[in-house]
Amino acid sequence: MKKINMKGMRKLSITATAMVAAAVMALAGCGSSSSSSSSSSGSDSTSGAKTTKFVLGGLWPETGSLAYLAPPELAAEKLAVKDINDAGGVLGNKITTVDADTSDADHADQNTSAAQSVLSKNPSFIIGPASSSVVKNTYKSITSQNIPMLSMGATSAGFSGLSDYFFRTVAPDTVQGAVMGNLIAQDGVQKLAIAVFNDEYGTGLRDTIVKTASAAGVDIIYGEKDTFDPTETNFSSIATAIKASNPDATLVIAFDQTKPLLKALASAGVNTKKLYFVDGNTSDYSSELDAGLLEGSKGTIPGINPSDDFVKRLESTGVDLKNTTTYGAETYDGIILAALAAQKGGSADGKTIQANMAAVSGSTKGEKCDSYKACVALLKDGKEIQYKGQTSIGAFNDAHDPSSASIGVYKYDADNKPVFDHSQEGSVPKA
């Protein structure tokens, strides 16, 4: 899951609904599949045949536990399409879109039916899903057809080099985990307890944090191997066990389980001013918890905060962002990169886009440009480019991860809202 960037980056307050945010990185499930499209027929060609028609496929969590993530992603899609088409489109044609609702990973049938709905329109490229678990349920059906896909939020470390046709604009959990582990150690924590749900995202991130923190001298006194079921609703026994372990601080890795878990920790007498959260739950709890309960606690979220100007542009699309911009920048940049790849390669087919994604991201160390319009102008002059958009990620490496990315560190205020403190850039390990 990624990141929970909020409107007003310098006094960021992430909404409670965004609490399940990095669910984006791992959940996927309920609801019935649906799709909508501004292109009823899609591209006339297969993923390998040359074409000038760019059909953008989108897989979004419009229903289910991740539904709060859809608005900023859909707004970013609308904005990117507008910017591309206003600049002349791709290869002289306006791009069209076909979208489908994947819901979340609890209902794999909808994940796959949404993917098939989009694939039936012969897309040139697919943006999404954001969740690692939903990606796991869908990527083979997409990449096997030589259609490139890009996830804006799937942070699973195991996805590095997943497929020649899989890309992402967010760093793998190895980066966030290392930053969090070092943050815990730098804060002087000597005894750490961990509450983590039994989920690929949760345990993978936990293991990286444990490795980094332990190497820095932190003793993991609870939760190094323990997990709880994602469907758990009663956390009293876990909270009691954590209290009994007498930790200096507690790391919580969960999605929508976080609220009841926090209440249980508080009831058990655990120090809630010394908690650490990750992108799945670094959220606004101002309306859920007593004022000051989390003051001083910290969280990490992959990526940078979007600029105020970019947030305003997202709002200008008419989509109600629900006070969150989670994965908006990653979605926008992913679409722009794909359009530039088609423009550079001279065709909007999947193979051409895949072959040029790394180059337009900067792997050939071309001239820097920060907008689709500016980059296209350079391409038309025969120049190599390096698109530097909203996320400021490094060029795609051989595993199709960004070669470098930022992790934001947030600190909770007296209203139980996470406020952006600083960002730390990290290099992405090679697969």
Regions found by a protein language model. Name each.
Residues K2-A431:
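Extracytosolic ligand-binding ectodomains
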